[in-house]
Amino acid sequence: VRLKEDELSKNMIKRCYSKNFHEKFPTYSSCSVSENFKYYPYFKEWCNKQAGYTSQDDKGNAFQLDKDILVKGNKVYSEELCVFVPKEINMLMVKCGRKRGDNPIGVFYHNREKKYVAKCKVRNKTVHLGYYFTSTEAFIVYKNFKESYIKEVSNKWKDQIDVRVYEALMNYHVEITD
């Protein structure tokens, strides 16, 4: 029987150092693991002391290890910046760069309408936020909607997540360059 910490450790190492993984998920090619986290007994002990480590979401899924909620864009798995969060929170920060091309986050060009459309994922469903003449207009609508949604989800999980996660999410700002 594999321990949860063992799976987490192996997945973390694979994400940072596997060339095969990087071919499928190139954003991880610049990620690394702190020296302490490379030492399994240390990582195991650290996990067992963290808020959310033994928690489950409302579907019975274990909370996930996250490296970049506390510091946007963080590329290092380390004890200072990693936290355990429910999948719903982890999915809030997923960016779909390949699908949107050169447009701002949350914005796509609709060829048939000849307008920009703002869209946002909410609980795994796409919410259409309207058509706009400029990508900037569409982005502002997306930004306001997304920041409000992040706060809503943060409040839902407030009593079950690390206070640092709650504060980071409540202060999160969507940037046009995300």
Question: What are the roles of these predicted feature ranges?
Answer:
Residues 89, 149-178:
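Extended, polar beta-sheet/loop recognition surfaces of beta-rich domains
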Residues 19, 23, 151-152:
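Short loop/turn hinge sites at secondary-structure boundaries
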Residues 2-3, 10, 15-17, 24-115, ...:
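Short, cationic Gly/His-enriched loop motifs
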Residues 43, 107, 118, 132, ...:
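An aromatic-rich alpha-helical recognition segment common to small helix-rich domains
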Residues 2-3, 21, 110, 157-166:
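Short, structured coil/loop segments at alpha-helix boundaries
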Residues 89, 114, 125-127, 137:
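Generic "edge-of-domain/loop-turn" microfeature
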